[in-house]
Amino acid sequence: KKSLALDFKSKEGFEILTKLIKKSDVVIDNFKPGFWDKVGLTNEWFNKNTKKIVRNSISGYGDVRPQGGLPGYDFLLQAESGLMKITGEKDGNPMKLGVAIVDIVTGMNAVISVLAALLLKRKVTDQSILTEVNLYNTGIFLLANVASNNLISGKEAKKYGNGHPNIVPYNLFKTKNGDIAISVGNDNQFKIFSNLIGFPNWAKNNRFKTNENRVINRIELEDLIQNALSTNDANYWYQVFLNERIPCAIVRSVSEALCHEQTLKNDMVKDIPHPKGKKFKSVNTPITINKKRGLDVPLSPPLLGEHSYEILTKRLSMSDKQFLAHCKNGVIRDGRYKK
């Protein structure tokens, strides 16, 4: 990611912007709907001047009323989409997720739409392609199986804490020294699980024999499991279940997760150079291509306008004299760090 700071409300800045667009393959924006039309860069302009371009616009709600055109915020969209109503303990207040999940997935959807459009561009060559994503649609999309259950059954979704509406046991349980997550996905797994914790008769009991009945008798069964697991520590049960391929995980803190051997072996923590000469640690990309992850020398989040000079002199062949004049007039900000 590189930063160009440009005042394109000015005549000179607008001219620079249009030149950059014409030399681009993809243009992504997060302006309010209608912004491009307002500044004169309509769909007709893009189709006439930039037939090779794929565009992507990210907004809060799209351009359809009643809320189209309003700004969007992750916290508010978690509330409006229903996500808060299905997050938290059964009798607790609506709760947001621990990360800005709507923001994050909207960005991922933007990337997916751009990649799909680039493939389509092989066939559609006579006009630019516009893709659009918004936070509201992403929030609704994230309801996933909860939305399906509601649409098919007509029943209002409930909060299950760490549980699952359709699978039991699927929850956190306390051990002697910490919490462990258990996800028993079918009746055969439950038979093995019951035997491992010392209660093989559970799998023969009609109240627990099938997942359907385990869901009905959820509270009773979870209490029994809790009593059994509290007799030993988390790592003990983790090894017992892991050896028999029962899905489970020890609940870690963020610090524990970032320092875990698997995280480090997967190269998920990276030293990033800072523009001011220092280094800081950050999470690496989760994607590998041909076993290679990310850049050899990853870029830090840029200073504002840090790459203005690089972009304009290389992409537009702007002279140093022109660049300095635009900086003096406030059209461009030169954010290069000067030691």
Regions found by a protein language model. Name each.
Residues H274-A325:
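Flexible, small-/acidic-enriched active-site or ligand-binding loops
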Residues L242-N266, D271:
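Conserved PLP cofactor-binding pocket of PLP-dependent enzymes
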Residues V168-E244, C248:
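Aromatic-enriched alpha-helical interface/lid elements that frame and gate functional surfaces
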Residues K23, F35-I180, V184-G185, I192:
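Active-site-adjacent "lid/gating" segments in soluble enzymes
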Residues K321-K339:
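Amphipathic terminal alpha-helices
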Residues K2-K48, S230:
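A structured beta-alpha segment of the ubiquitous adenosine-cofactor-binding alpha/beta core
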